[in-house]
Structures are given as structure tokens and as C-alpha cells.
């Protein structure tokens, strides 16, 4: 029998295992207003979970995984460990092949980051055909994909900590 349940990171019982956690948000701000909405959703989830949040801003989605890697290396040097990463951004299809490159490489970069570091990563980089689709997914009151990416990272972090205990 398979059961499913929707969990909110704001529930106190679900915050167990997140004590002292530090989560890095790397946001591509090519579409400023959409970036604000994605960040608001992610921040709300992470703050409700009681984790420390750091935000790094980069120009666009393609730079998100690179900036995350740079931040992880710096964190190792300084001893200020990062427990999870949330990547945020928006890629809207245009008339050139550039969409496929940015969409695919930003997603691959985040997956590679998670695999190389055994690190919980939430991918909140929207890849859509239109700006209207982006808004439907980004708005906290609708799709809240920023919040969803943060919840994904927290879920993986809880799993990691539970398995390592």
C-alpha cells in the first residue's frame, strides 16, 4: 500500500532534525519581479523551519549552480558549513536555442552540485514558455515554486540527518 501526505516545513514536528541548519539560496535575478516572488516563497518556508538563511544574488539562472559551488568551497575554507542549497530563477522560452541551453545546464548544474557534495538541493529555477506561466508558478499565492524548492531541500536535509544519526 502506498500512502502520500503533504507536509509543510512550518509544522513544528517537521522541523525536528533541522536544528542549527544553514541553507543557502542562490537566486538568478534576470526577471526581477519574478525573482522577488520566488525568494519570498523560499524565505517564508525556510524561516518557518527556523533555519539560518543566506542569499546570494547572480544575474541569471545559468550562474546559479556556479555561484553555489563557489559558496560551498568558501564555506569549507571558512568552516561555515552549508547544509542545503536552494536555486531560484526563471528561464522563459524565446525564439532561439538559448532557452534549451540555459534550462538544461542550470538544472544539470544543480543536480551535479547535489551529487558531487551529497548535498540537499532544491531546484526552483522555472523553465516556462511564457511570462504568464512564470507568474502562475512563482506567486506565493498560487504555485509557490520558490517555497516548493525550499521544502524539497529541507526534506532532503531531514532525510540526510535521520540516516546519519
From Swiss-Prot:
Pathway linked to the protein: Cofactor biosynthesis; riboflavin biosynthesis; riboflavin from 2-hydroxy-3-oxobutyl phosphate and 5-amino-6-(D-ribitylamino)uracil: step 1/2
Binding site for (2S)-2-hydroxy-3-oxobutyl phosphate: 95-96, 137
Catalysed reaction equations from the record: (2S)-2-hydroxy-3-oxobutyl phosphate + 5-amino-6-(D-ribitylamino)uracil = 6,7-dimethyl-8-(1-D-ribityl)lumazine + phosphate + 2 H2O + H(+)
A GO biological-process term: riboflavin biosynthetic process
EC identifiers of the protein: 2.5.1.78
Record has Isomerase as a keyword: no
GO MF assignments: 6,7-dimethyl-8-ribityllumazine synthase activity
Keywords, sorted A to Z: Riboflavin biosynthesis, Transferase
Chain residues that bind 5-amino-6-(D-ribitylamino)uracil: 30, 61-63, 90-92, 123
GO annotations of cellular component type: cytosol; riboflavin synthase complex
Residues annotated as catalytic: 98
Task performed by this protein: Catalyzes the formation of 6,7-dimethyl-8-ribityllumazine by condensation of 5-amino-6-(D-ribitylamino)uracil with 3,4-dihydroxy-2-butanone 4-phosphate. This is the penultimate step in the biosynthesis of riboflavin.
Assigned protein family: Belongs to the DMRL synthase family.
Name the record gives this protein: 6,7-dimethyl-8-ribityllumazine synthase
Organism: Xanthobacter autotrophicus (strain ATCC BAA-1158 / Py2)
Lineage: Bacteria, Pseudomonadati, Pseudomonadota, Alphaproteobacteria, Hyphomicrobiales
Gene this protein is translated from: ribH
Amino acid at each position: 500500500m502506498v500512502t502520500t501526505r503533504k507536509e509543510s516545513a512550518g509544522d513544528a514536528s517537521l522541523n525536528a532534525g533541522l536544528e542549527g541548519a544553514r541553507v543557502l539560496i542562490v537566486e538568478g535575478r534576470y526577471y526581477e519581479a519574478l525573482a522577488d516572488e520566488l525568494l519570498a516563497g523560499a524565505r517564508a518556508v525556510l524561516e518557518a523551519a527556523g533555519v539560518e538563511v543566506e542569499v546570494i544574488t547572480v544575474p541569471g539562472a545559468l550562474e546559479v549552480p556556479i555561484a553555489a559551488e563557489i559558496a560551498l568551497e568558501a564555506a569549507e575554507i571558512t568552516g561555515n558549513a552549508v547544509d542545503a542549497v536552494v536555486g531560484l530563477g526563471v528561464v522563459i522560452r524565446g525564439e532561439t536555442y538559448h532557452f534549451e541551453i540555459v534550462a538544461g545546464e542550470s538544472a544539470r548544474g544543480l543536480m551535479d552540485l547535489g551529487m558531487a557534495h551529497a548535498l540537499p538541493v532544491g531546484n526552483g529555477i522555472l523553465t516556462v514558455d511564457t511570462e504568464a506561466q512564470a507568474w502562475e508558478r512563482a506567486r506565493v499565492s498560487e504555485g509557490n515554486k520558490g517555497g516548493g524548492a525550499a521544502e524539497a531541500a529541507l526534506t532532503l536535509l531531514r532525510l540526510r540527518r535521520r540516516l546519519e544519526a
